[in-house]
Amino acid sequence: MKRLIVSAALILAPLAAHAACAPTDFAIQDFKMKATGSGQGVRLSLSGQLVNHCAEAAAAQVKIEAKDSGGKVLQAKQGWPAGTTNIAPGQSVEFDLGRLFRYQTDMQNYTVGVVDVRTW
């Protein structure tokens, strides 16, 4: 019986971690792309601010897509700007997920959005 209870708790635990907030309760402001260096040493900075407009503290996962001039996705990466820390209502955190990307000369456009929300 104890095993059944423990098993049920482990299965249901991830469900309890999702916040009552939705991805639309978060906004990304001042998103900027900057490349520094040259040749093989080019480093990307893909930075911005993640703002919590939800009524409760929560964290959000951000997805960035790097696209060529035709709109084809070359690379896509996801990250949690605040890590495992919840962002208080009305507060923001700065992020830079550029280190997750390997620079390609045909990267022309970038899209960014919130894809998941949870409480830690």
Give the label of every model feature segment:
Residues 75-104:
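Intrinsically disordered, low-complexity Pro/Gly/Ser/Thr-rich segments with frequent PxxP/GP/PP motifs
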Residues 1-4:
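Positively charged n-region of N-terminal signal peptides that target proteins for export
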Residues 99-120:
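Terminal connector regions
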Residues 44-50:
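Short, well-ordered beta-strand segments enriched in hydrophobic/aromatic residues
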Residues 9-19:
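Hydrophobic h-region of N-terminal signal peptides that target proteins for export
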Residues 52-56, 70:
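Short, acidic/polar linear motifs in exposed loop/turn regions
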Residues 26-27, 59, 71-81:
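Short beta-strand and strand-turn-strand segments in soluble, beta-rich domains
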